[in-house]
Amino acid sequence: MVRLAVPFAIAATLLAGGMASCTNTGQTQMVTYVKRAANVTRDQFWDYWQTEHAPKVAPLAVHFNITRYQQIQVGGQILPTAAGSTEPAATEPVEFDGIAMFLYKSDEVLAAMLAHPYYLEVVEPDEHVFIDKAAFGAGMVATFVGTDIEIVDGKKDVWVGNRATREKYDKVFQSYL
């Protein structure tokens, strides 16, 4: 039962907070800093995450129309922060070994994905292989959820804003060419 606490806490926070009120793309971006299990090196973590875990997540994400799932292979330190919180849970930074990013249309979609039997029986148990589930947030040491605002997409400027401002900075930029 403890294994289910974190996914349901994330889903409940998202649903209760109404954080899907996107004004531009209509989508929500979740960025999660992940801590590796103590028995794996950072390189082993990255390799397993990309080659073993990602193929388990991909069909589930596609089924739920997740727009984008990305992994960033990077390490560092961050203040532990629970999903939906605007304040850190502690003042001491914690290590992280990667960043997972999900872009999705609604909080309900993410909640349904995290409650799906495939997630509970295949994906979540696999997380125990390479993620430090004893760490803050069950290894998701900091999670931030916010509105997705596209500025450049497909090598194109897609910023939506004041036309005069756009023209001003297009002109300034052109003066540097």
Regions found by a protein language model. Give the residues of each.
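Fungal secretory targeting signals
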Residues: M1-S21
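Macromolecular interaction modules
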Residues: G17-L177
